Amino acid sequence: MLRITIPSTEFWDEAKQEFVYTKAQTLQLEHSLVSLSKWESRWNKPFLTKQEKTLEETVDYVKCMTLTQNVKPEVYNYLTNSNINEVNRYIALPMTATQFFEEKKSPGSKEQITAELVYYWMIVLNIPFECQKWHLNKLFTLIRVCDIKSRPPKKHSRREIMKRNAALNAARKKKWNTKG
């Protein structure tokens, strides 16, 4: 969970001809499947694309991420660039210690990832719906781990087996100081 503080501000209200002062507001945010689904249902387009979001779309995603109750809508008008950058850094965090080491890089799927597709993966992999509130990158890692662990073991070619055995034998020879 991310906590950001929108600082207090002072500005001139042209309509009322007076200075207006706003109090600082602390928001609790979570980048989750729930917030992704809310945003996609409002904008009717996928959030997880390489396309830049407009300021309006970004601010609306912050609204969708908000866990704090009873936040006045005008509070979001006072988000600073620093607040937006902090949210973007949080969205990019892996939120897990799991790392994947792939033997061969295959070209990525061209399938567009939407909230419904992620829910489908959760159902297929028997991931409980409580996980929809996790940080999205942590959920993606769990989905990937479940997918990898549910696959049948990979069959190795004869060449790969011989190469692995040769490496193991060389390591044992070195460890035990023998010639074979």
Each language-model region and where it sits:
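An amphipathic, hydrophobic-aromatic interaction surface with interspersed Lys/Arg
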Residues: M1-S41, E52, L67-K155
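Alpha-helical oligomerization segments
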Residues: L142-G180
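Short, hydrophobic/proline-enriched secondary-structure or compact coil segments at domain edges
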Residues: L55-Q69
